[in-house]
From Swiss-Prot:
Subcellular location: Cytoplasm
SUPFAM superfamilies assigned: P-loop containing nucleoside triphosphate hydrolases, RecA protein, C-terminal domain
Organism expressing this protein natively: Vibrio parahaemolyticus serotype O3:K6 (strain RIMD 2210633)
Similarity section: Belongs to the RecA family.
Region (Disordered): 328-347
GO biological process terms on file: DNA recombination; DNA repair; SOS response
Protein name: Protein RecA
Chain's role: Can catalyze the hydrolysis of ATP in the presence of single-stranded DNA, the ATP-dependent uptake of single-stranded DNA by duplex DNA, and the ATP-dependent hybridization of homologous single-stranded DNAs. It interacts with LexA causing its activation and leading to its autocatalytic cleavage.
An example Gene Ontology molecular-function term: single-stranded DNA binding
Length: 347
């Protein structure tokens, strides 16, 4: 770039920063602070699948799946993790179905959690926007998009047609919310339901409610499915769950996490530590026995999990080592011309 153009660009950048504030425009490679802050989901395998160690702050996230697949459980686990870090959380309960007893069992501080049960979709989204603009909220959950009913539909007759009303409402809300969430570094999670497209012969007939705007504005989209039941004898005590990262703007997408959701407990963290520890040779398995650093920790997976629950310091050590091994490191700077990049170590 010639000198005159450089001067003109510098003047334009100075004018923009003076008018709109520092950081309103920057060179993409300049700012090392652009690393996205994340909050753990409560599941180690999902944190690893996301590539950044959790869900990103200041972004929109969509979680969808069939009924009883663990969508609300996942968001409550994330709220509990955020509260442990001292963050403020809000839950917009459009379905009017939040169970405070279950939330408390998952570790949510219900006395500190802000809850709203709005009457209309517009009211719910206005509350979201007001909370985002306040700058005081770190995590917001909207449960669910399908329950965000436009005011015109609520006030109309039962058989009235309201084509595209909800999609238009959401599209407008996304345009307003995105900038406010970024400025206040607040994460907004939308829980969504699945519907079937009529007349689809080829491809996936499943779609999510509320039009296409949310799909475009979301930085992360998670598809959560129940793949089986966990039994103790004849009693079902939990779900085998698969979570697929369908869209990811902060790391590589299309990775999957397999985990267990235990009824009344949430994610089986110790089970994940055992499985990932064995896979990556941090935990040794000989027959039915599991051992760590040469010490036996249990015969059978259930006993090994109980041992880790009783010894949280060992569980924490295994968790930290797995995160160091498996989470994507920050992108290294490009080598200078003529230099060879260092060989990356594979795990």
């Amino acid at each position: 770039m010639d000198e005159n153009k450089q001067k003109a660009l510098a003047a334009a950048l100075g004018q923009i920063e003076k008018q709109f504030g520092k950081g309103s425009i920057m060179r993409l490679g300049d700012n090392r602070a652009m690393d996205v802050e994340t909050i753990s989901t409560g599941s180690l395998s999902l944190d690893i699948a996301l590539g950044a160690g959790g869900l990103p702050m200041g972004r929109i996230v969509e979680i969808y799946g069939p009924e009883s697949s663990g969508k609300t459980t996942l968001t409550l686990e994330l709220i509990a993790a955020a509260q442990r870090e001292g963050k403020t959380c809000a839950f917009i309960d459009a379905e009017h179905a939040l169970d405070p007893v279950y939330a408390k069992k998952l570790g949510v501080d219900i006395d500190a959690l802000l809850v709203s049960q709005p009457d209309t979709g517009e009211q719910a989204l206005e509350i979201c926007d007001a909370l985002a603009r306040s700058g005081a909220i770190d995590v917001m959950v909207v449960d669910s998009v399908a329950a965000l009913t436009p005011k015109a539909e609520i006030e109309g007759e039962m058989g009235d047609s309201h084509m595209g009303l909800q999609a238009r409402m959401l599209s407008q809300a996304m345009r307003k919310l995105t900038g406010n969430l970024k400025q206040s570094n607040c994460m907004c999670i939308f829980i969504n339901q699945i519907r079937m497209k009529i007349g689809v012969m080829f491809g996936n007939p499943e779609t999510t409610t509320g039009g296409n705007a949310l799909k475009f504005y979301a930085s992360v989209r998670l598809d959560i499915r129940r793949t089986g039941a966990i039994k103790e004898g004849d009693e079902v005590v939990g779900n085998e769950t698969r979570i697929k990262v369908v869209k990811n703007k902060i790391a590589a997408p299309f990775k999957e996490a397999n985990t267990q959701i235990m009824y009344g407990q949430g994610f089986n963290r110790e089970g994940e530590l055992i499985d990932l520890g064995v896979k990556h040779k941090l935990v040794e398995k000989a027959g039915a026995w599991y051992s760590y650093n040469g010490d036996k920790i249990g015969q059978g997976k259930a006993n090994a999990c109980n041992y880790l629950r009783e010894h949280p310091e060992i569980a924490k050590t295994i968790d930290t080592k797995l995160r160091e091994m498996l989470l994507s490191p920050a992108q290294p700077e490009a080598p200078a011309a003529g230099e060879k990049p260092e060989q990356e170590e594979e795990f």
